[in-house]
Amino acid sequence: MIKLFLLILISFSIFSNEEIEEVITTGTLLKESESKFSPVEIITAEKFDEIGVSTIAEISKYLSASSGSHFQTNTMDGVDQGMSAITLRGLDHASTLLLINSKRQTFTGTPSYNGEGYVDANIIPKIALTKMEILKEGATSVYGSDAVAGVINFITVKKFSGYKLDLDSQYSTNYNQNDIGFGFLFGKDFENFDLVFGFERMERTPLKAYEIDQISELSVSGLGNSFKILGDDVIESGLYAGEYSNGQTIPDPNCIENGGILDGRCRFAYGRGFNIVNDESHEKFYTSLSNRNHDISLIFSNVKVNDNPQSPSYPALPFLARDIEPGVGGSPFNVPVRWYGRPLGGRYPWRESPKDISQYHFNYSFLKDFENLSLETSFTHSQHENFHNRPDIVDSRFLSALYGNGGESGDLQWNIFDPSQNSIELVEHIKGAEISKKIGDLTTFDILAQTSYRNIN
């Protein structure tokens, strides 16, 4: 995506007897904007250190204007685990614009669970942050609909001399979870340029849902492995031996042995395998080279979500309206039944859905002051890439197996009534995953000119 922004600002000064003390303009691209005035809030790097957050987006917890931000593990919804959004005024993620040194960063190619694109705040290294400017009012007149809720501008270090080392360790007091961080910043004068280099790394250990009381216990699905019989029937022998009446719900007789919860029907405890906090690795690099006329910067970030456990498979929702005929899927019944379950339930191990998220932001700006003209031209290119692996089953293979045409040999049957009868070969054959690489990128050219002629600025 390529955008060209040309900003021309003209104001007329009208002299009269009325004295105008001061006019403040906020939310513009003017490099001399007086952002200290309301409604702009400034959060300095020192404030970040004082609060003690592990990542930039976690500052949302301490902002009164922030509501609906996303910066923690979201196992239940979407595919954007490992990404972060800072949201203002309770609007959706796409309504708050995040800038880096007043320049745009690309929206992610991966949407939130609501289908919204947003700027992933995980690109910003704390070690290289000078301050964070928050424009808490809408700024659509300058930035467009991306800024309905407001603008957040991250200002990075441009001039630094010497070395800076940050060591950070945060841990939960009641559970075995911790974040361990390391940051390094180096700066010096180099051939009439200010050179700054930064590196940051964080390792985050997981926190399982079952470690916290009354979390995973509440996460129970009725779609474990149960059946609704669609007619009166009598089974003389076997696992389902008995007499059944039309409309009766029949749970898996081996529900508990198969890892389910028996409560009227055979339920699936999906919460016990999920994480509250995922196992993550964060790495960020920052480089800046600048002087009076040139400003070059590059930020690179990589976030790996190493585990992110998911259910063995998701519910077989099409079968809520599809009858299982006698003999299909190992059915012992003489009449059709309706299946309330999932191909891989509680007896099967949980599967991991790792993520590998990389993004970068490059900017070159040329600045020149003439006698009556101040000119800034800049080129910015950014990209966000998310490699995504979400496990499930291959529907076509599962359906073939239900009808006895499964496996490489094409003659194996999947038994939904007695999962213990399913061979390892057939289990592996129906397994699959949604594997994708989603990329978002943005290229912008900015031209900003300021001049004055007589009474016109």
Model feature map: region roles:
Residues 16-49, 93:
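Short, acidic, small-residue-rich periplasmic hinge/interaction motif at the N-terminus
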Residues 32, 61-104:
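Extracytoplasmic beta-strand/coil segments of soluble accessory domains associated
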Residues 38-61, 86-91, 117-122, 169-173, ...:
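Short, polar/charged loop or turn motifs at beta-strand boundaries
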Residues 56-59, 63, 84-87, 101, ...:
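N-terminal periplasmic accessory domains that precede
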Residues 59, 97, 133-135, 151-157, ...:
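Predominantly transmembrane beta-strands of Gram-negative outer membrane beta-barrel pores used
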Residues 84, 150, 180-184, 283-287, ...:
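Hydrophobic, lipid-facing positions within transmembrane beta-strands of outer-membrane proteins
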Residues 103-136:
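Short acidic/polar hinge/loop motifs at secondary-structure boundaries
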Residues 113, 218, 249-278, 295-446, ...:
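Surface-exposed, low-complexity loop segments enriched in small/polar and acidic residues
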